[in-house]
């Protein structure tokens, strides 16, 4: 019985919601789900999971420096950025997904060119 209680305690830790904090303000970043992303955002996230190919190969997958300090502080090179196509835009537009970590599993969506981010919960 003691082991069962311990197992449930450990499982409860994994069920807790993930939060990310703005490195500059220390406020929790808002979250979004994959389903709430625009279609183009879901498409970009699928390409990230597949490893490409990306429509903006020269820029997609490049290092995101987090100069604005809106994402949690991490070592240089931790974050990579990817373009989320904007219908009707002649350039890359303002929408991006920024992912971090070795397997690029910690991802954030911005619709306003890095001013604000939402943690994507999968």
Regions found by a protein language model. Give the residues of each.
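Hydrophobic helical h-region of N-terminal Sec-dependent signal peptides
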Residues: 6-10
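N-terminal secretory signal peptides
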Residues: 20-70
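Functional cores of ribonucleases/endoribonucleases
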Residues: 53-122
